[in-house]
């Protein structure tokens, strides 16, 4: 599957990414290659393969929580599309 530059621009806009024309061309090729690979995987016959919920039999290894310093507010909000004081502004989804 080959993505068009318009499709790459739409995906970038949804992800709130600004891409240069060169990056758009690069990502169009890379994303197309990924989609081609996924299409190949979709063609495989996996009817005899037992479903699994996790790649590791023992599950996800855990580790103890560790308290570490966070980012300063200005650094955390540096790439926010909208902010109010030291808070992120997000679209209202519940009335």
UniProtKB/Swiss-Prot annotation:
Keywords: ATP-binding, Ligase, Nucleotide-binding, Protein biosynthesis. The keyword Ligase applies. The keyword Protein biosynthesis applies. It catalyses: L-glutamyl-tRNA(Gln) + L-glutamine + ATP + H2O = L-glutaminyl-tRNA(Gln) + L-glutamate + ADP + phosphate + H(+); L-aspartyl-tRNA(Asn) + L-glutamine + ATP + H2O = L-asparaginyl-tRNA(Asn) + L-glutamate + ADP + phosphate + 2 H(+). Pfam families: GatC. GO terms for molecular function: asparaginyl-tRNA synthase (glutamine-hydrolyzing) activity; ATP binding; glutaminyl-tRNA synthase (glutamine-hydrolyzing) activity. Its EC number is 6.3.5.-. GO terms for biological process: glutaminyl-tRNAGln biosynthesis via transamidation; regulation of translational fidelity; translation. Belongs to the GatC family. Heterotrimer of A, B and C subunits. Allows the formation of correctly charged Asn-tRNA(Asn) or Gln-tRNA(Gln) through the transamidation of misacylated Asp-tRNA(Asn) or Glu-tRNA(Gln) in organisms which lack either or both of asparaginyl-tRNA or glutaminyl-tRNA synthetases. The reaction takes place in the presence of glutamine and ATP through an activated phospho-Asp-tRNA(Asn) or phospho-Glu-tRNA(Gln). PANTHER family: GLUTAMYL-TRNA(GLN) AMIDOTRANSFERASE SUBUNIT C, MITOCHONDRIAL. This is Aspartyl/glutamyl-tRNA(Asn/Gln) amidotransferase subunit C.
């Amino acid at each position: 599957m080959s993505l068009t530059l318009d499709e790459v621009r739409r995906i970038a806009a949804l992800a709130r990414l600004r891409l240069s024309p060169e990056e758009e061309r690069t990502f169009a090729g890379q994303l197309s290659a990924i989609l081609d690979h996924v299409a190949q995987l979709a063609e495989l016959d996996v009817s005899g393969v037992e479903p699994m919920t996790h790649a590791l039999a023992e599950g996800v290894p855990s580790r103890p929580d560790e308290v570490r310093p966070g980012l300063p507010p200005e650094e955390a909000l540096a790439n926010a599309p909208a902010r109010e004081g030291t808070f992120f502004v997000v679209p209202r989804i519940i009335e």
